[in-house]
Amino acid sequence: MEKISVAVRFRPPTTAAPAADQSPSSTGGDREWRVDDDTRITLLHRSAPVPGASFAFDHVFDGAATNERIYGVLVRSLIRAAVDGFNGTAFAYGQTSSGKTFTMNGSADHPGIIPLAVRDVFDTAREVSDREFLIRVSYMEIYNEEINDLLTLGSEKLPIHESLERGVYVSGLREEIVNSAEQVFKLLELGEANRHFGETNMNVRSSRSHTIFRMVIESSAKNHMDSGDAIRVSVLNLVDLAGSERIAKTGAGGVRLKEGKHINKSLMILGNVINKLSENGKQRGHIPYRDSKLTRILQPALGGNAKTSIICTAAPEEIHVEETRGTLQFASRAKCVSNCAQVNEILTDAALLKRQKQEIEELRKKLQGSHSEVLEQVILKQRNDMHKSELERDRLAMELDEERRLRETLEHRLAEQQKMLDGISNTSISPDQFTDSIQFESLKTPTSKERPAEFVASRANYSKDVEFSPIPENLGTVADEDLWMQLNKGCVTDLEMLEMTPGFKCAPSLADDKASVATPDEEPIDARCQRLEKDCTADRQQLEDSKAWRAALEEERDTLKRENSSLLDALAKARQDADHLVADRLEALRELDMEKSRMDELKQEIKLFSQAFSLRQGQLTSLYTKSKAIVENCKTSQLALP
C-alpha cells in the first residue's frame, strides 16, 4: 500500500504586496496563512494570541516556487514509474483562479507539468536500452457531465465502459500513436483550441470543464528470443480540474451558472469519494465512484492500482480564506488515502512459468534464516540416503545378474558332462569282447586268406587241457610223413590246404588269459568317470551355493526397497511440513502487515484528533478573546454614559 502524495501551492498574491515577498503571510488583513518548514500551513489571527487551524502535507510551495521545481519534487517519480509499467495520475485541485491551469499547462516561458512530463517520458524511454516502446495519447474533457474528445472536432458524447481486460475506459476516444514530444505538443495545441473557457468576475479565462490528458505506454523486450519477458502497459493521467466557484463571487449567470453547478457537483462527489476512502476500512461504506463521470474515470487513481500525486492550489488573500480552508481540508483527507500500485503486465505462458519459478525461488530465500533450515538439512540428508540406497540397489542388481549368468554357465557345463557320461555308458564293451577282438587282429597275417562269411571256427575252452599226440621218443628213425601222421593220429592233410598261423602258447592258464585280455585303456576310463562324477558333485554344490547367495541378495534387495519406500515417505512428509511452514510464515507476515496498517490508521486518527483538538482550542480561545473584548467594550460604553 502507498499513500497518495499531496502538495499545496500558494499562488502569488494579486493584492498590492511587495514583489520581494511572495509568502502567503504577506497579504495583510486580520487572517493570514503561514508556511512552516515547507510542510505545514497554519492559519494566523493577528488579533488572537493563539494560532488557528494547522495542516501538514508532504510539500508546501509558496508563490516563488516554479513549475519546474514542483514537477521535480512531485511528478518526476511518477514518470519513471509509468515507464516501468505502473499507472500514474497527477491532478490539480483548488478554487477558481488559484493557478491550476498554469500549474498543469504553464506558459511559453514557464512550461507546466503536462509539457514537462511529455518530454520526460520520451527522454526516460530512450534511456531504457533493452526495451522498445509504443506510446499513444488521448485528450478529453468533461463539460456539463458530458465527455468530449478534444482531438476530434464536433465529436459526439462518449460513454464510459468497463471490462476485465481494459478496466474503466471511454469508448470511441481517439488515440494517436506518437514518436516525439513535438508531435504531442501539436496535439495539445489542438486540444486546447477545442476546450471550453469562459470569463467570470474572478478569472478572465476560466476553465469551464475538467480535462484529462492520457498517455498509454506499452513496452516489450527488444530481445524477442527472451519469451519469458512480459509486455508492460501503463496509463499516465494528467488532469486539470475546473475550480470550485461561489456564485456570489463569480457573478455567474445563464450558461456560466449551469457550468458552475456541474463543476461544483463533480468536485463535491470527488470530495465525497476522498472522504470515504480516508475513513477506516471497517467504517467505510459505499464509495460513490459512479455518481460522477470524473470520479468514474479517475477510479483507478483513487484507492486503486496507480501512483497518485495531487497538487492543491490555494489563494493567499484573506478574502479567500474559507475557500482555501476547504481546499486544505480536502488535501488532508486525500493524504490519508492509500493506493495499491503494481506493474501492469500481459503475461504469456512462458512469462508466467518464468514468473512462478522466480516466486518459488523468492519463497526459498524467505525460508532461509528460520528454523526451516533444519528441515532443509533433513530433506538433503534423506535425498543423499535415497541416492545411496539407489546405488546399492543397482550394485546388488548387477551382482544378481552376474550370479545368474554364472549359474547358467554351471548348469550348461553340468549338462554337457552328464551327456558325456551317458555316451560313455552306452558305448562300453565287455572284457571278453575286447579280448577276442584283440586276438582276432593279432591272428591276421600277410599271407592269410579272408574267411568266408559262413565259416565258423570254435576254440576249445581254456579250462580244459589241450589234447595232443604223444611225441615219439626216437625222432630220427621216423620219416617226415610218418612223423606227421603219428602226431596227427593217422590224419594226413594236404599241405597246400593249410594256412600259415602264428604260434600260440599252449595250454595257457585262466589267470594268464585274463591278464592277456586286459587292455591298457581300461584303467584311464574309470579314472575319468570318477573325475567327472567328482566334478558333477562339485558343480551341484556350487549351484546350491549360488542359489543360496541369490536368495540372500533378493532378500537384501527387498530390504533396500522397503528402506527406499520409507525414505520417500519421510521426504514427502518433510516437504509437506516445509509447505506448512511457508504457509504459516506467509500468514504471519500478512497478519503483521494488517497490524501495521491498523497502527498507521490509529496514528492517523490520533493525528486528526490532535488537529481537531487544536482547531477547537483555537476557536475557543478566539471566542474567549472576542467575548472578553465585547465585555470590555460594554464596560467602556457603560462608563462613557453620563
Swiss-Prot record:
Residues 12-27 have a biased composition (Low complexity). The keyword Nucleotide-binding applies. Residues 343-428, 540-612 form a coiled coil. CDD domains: KISc_CENP_E. Gene3D superfamilies: Kinesin motor domain. InterPro entries: Kinesin-like_fam, Kinesin_motor_CS, Kinesin_motor_dom, Kinesin_motor_dom_sf, P-loop_NTPase. PROSITE patterns: KINESIN_MOTOR_1, KINESIN_MOTOR_2. It comes from the Eukaryota. GO terms for molecular function: ATP binding; microtubule binding; microtubule motor activity. Residues 12-33 are annotated as: Disordered. GO terms for biological process: microtubule-based movement. ATP binds at residues 94-101. Residues 3-337 form the Kinesin motor domain. This is Kinesin-like protein KIN-7L. The lineage of its organism: Eukaryota, Viridiplantae, Streptophyta, Embryophyta, Tracheophyta. The gene is KIN7L.
